[in-house]
């Protein structure tokens, strides 16, 4: 059974395995840099370690592949019979990370 981990990043929890590419909320690092996630909630595989709230000494190491923005989301407000409307677009920034190692 392959080793996996659940990490906390950007206010979300993400299940990761070695070699997997994940998209997380924007991190302030350059593309090609190595990033370490210290908030590991669970490590699974042969045995499972559950943190209270995090697993002591466990880290997940990954490499930043690229920074980007998601597709545009358009919100539109409209007041009937008043001629009032407003259109606003938003593109959420993200970071693509490839997981290199899970250290339990």
Curated annotation (Swiss-Prot):
Keywords: Ribonucleoprotein, Ribosomal protein, RNA-binding, rRNA-binding
A GO MF term: structural constituent of ribosome
Matches recorded under InterPro entries: bL21-like (IPR028909), bL21-like_sf (IPR036164), Ribosomal_bL21 (IPR001787), Ribosomal_bL21_CS (IPR018258)
GO biological process: translation
GO cellular component: cytoplasm; ribonucleoprotein complex; ribosome
Function: This protein binds to 23S rRNA in the presence of protein L20.
Family statement drawn from the similarity comment of this UniProt entry: Belongs to the bacterial ribosomal protein bL21 family.
Subunit details: Part of the 50S ribosomal subunit. Contacts protein L20.
Protein name: Large ribosomal subunit protein bL21
Organism field: Streptococcus agalactiae serotype V (strain ATCC BAA-611 / 2603 V/R)
């Amino acid at each position: 059974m392959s080793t996996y981990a659940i990490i906390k990043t950007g206010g979300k929890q993400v299940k990761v395995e070695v070699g997997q590419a994940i998209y997380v909320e924007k991190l302030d690092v350059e593309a090609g840099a190595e990033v370490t996630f210290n908030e590991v909630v669970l490590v699974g595989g042969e045995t499972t370690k559950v943190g209270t709230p995090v697993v002591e000494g466990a880290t997940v190491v990954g490499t930043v592949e690229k920074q980007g923005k998601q597709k545009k989301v358009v919100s539109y407000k409209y007041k009937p019979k008043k001629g009032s409307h407003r259109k606003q677009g938003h593109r959420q920034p993200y970071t693509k990370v490839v997981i290199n190692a899970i250290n339990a």
